[in-house]
Amino acid sequence: MYARLSHFRWPAANTAEGIRVARELILPAFREAPGFRGLDVLIDRATGEGVGISWWVTEADAAVAGEDTALAAALANFPAVGFTFGARYTYELVVRG
């Protein structure tokens, strides 16, 4: 399994709206993507900084995450809440408890 780790930020005042967009638009779009196995979103409510970890069957699935048209359309909603992406990385899961 592979994890795609994405750093992000939005204004702390927009946290509730950012979470709503993630739950109602992003997660359903991810669920339609080939190889998708899960999504975890971690946020510091005081700063609006966070990390999204999406889980994928193969490295190739993780590599094309976000290129799917439904997912790209859902992600287009984030700029309205001041959302910006930072660095993105893909890692292989080697130990899980």
Predicted regions and their residues:
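Short S/T/G/P-rich N-terminal loop/turn motif that feeds into the first structured element of a domain
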Residues: 1-50, 57-69, 80-97
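A common structural junction motif
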Residues: 72-76
